Amino acid sequence: EPYAFGL
């Protein structure tokens, strides 16, 4: 999750 959105 590189953007801390659960990606």
Curated annotation (Swiss-Prot):
Cellular component, GO annotation: extracellular region
Q: Which domain of life is it from?
A: Eukaryota
Which keywords does this chain's UniProt record carry? Amidation, Neuropeptide, Secreted
Residues with PTM Leucine amide? L7
Quick check: keyword Secreted in the entry? yes
Compartments (UniProt record): Secreted
Q: Which GO BP terms apply?
A: neuropeptide signaling pathway
Q: What does this protein do?
A: May act as a neurotransmitter or neuromodulator.
Family, according to the entry, reads as follows: Belongs to the allatostatin family.
Protein name (Swiss-Prot/TrEMBL) = Carcinustatin-3
